[in-house]
Amino acid sequence: PSDVVARIVADGMSKHLGQTMVIENVGGAGGTLGSGRVASAEADGYTLLAGSMGSHVAAPVLTPNVRYDSERDFIPIGITADAPAVIVARKDFPANNMKEFVAYVKANGDKVKQAHGGVGSSSHMACL
């Protein structure tokens, strides 16, 4: 969702500032690749990051080789969106609600696979 939110915010900022905001979506590693790029960019006043709790709180703890320090390299400006996490499965999955899902995972954890945006991403944390 960071890319979508960034584009919506950039559109409003462009109108307000009277200049184009360019969005460069750097995907991969739960947002840590883009965060690392912004952390090492020249401090020009024009480079901003649409990050997440995953890339700035969870990933640095779970991934020892991130190329930035969230507290040292960034300053929070504001919250732009609140995106709830959802868990979905194939229609033929043997659980129809969260209670059944939790019971199934407890009994069959080795059979359950998850898809997420990277270690430490909000979708990864929601699946834990």
Regions from the PLM with identified roles:
Residues P1-I8, G27-A29, A115-S122:
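Extracytoplasmic "Venus flytrap"
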Residues S2-G18, C127-L128:
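Short, polar/charged alpha-helical segment
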Residues I8, G36-R37:
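Active-site signature of alpha/beta-hydrolase-fold catalytic machinery across serine-
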Residues M13, S40-G45, V61-L128:
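Hinge/capping helix and adjacent helix->loop/strand transition within the periplasmic-binding protein
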Residues T20-G36:
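Early extracytoplasmic/lumenal segment of secretory-pathway proteins
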Residues N25-G27, G51-S52, R90, G117:
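Active-site-proximal beta-strand/loop segments in catalytic clefts of secreted hydrolases
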Residues T32-S35, H56-V61, H124:
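Adenylate-forming
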Residues G45-G51:
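Paired acidic/hydrophobic, glycine-rich loop segments that form the ligand-binding mouth/hinge
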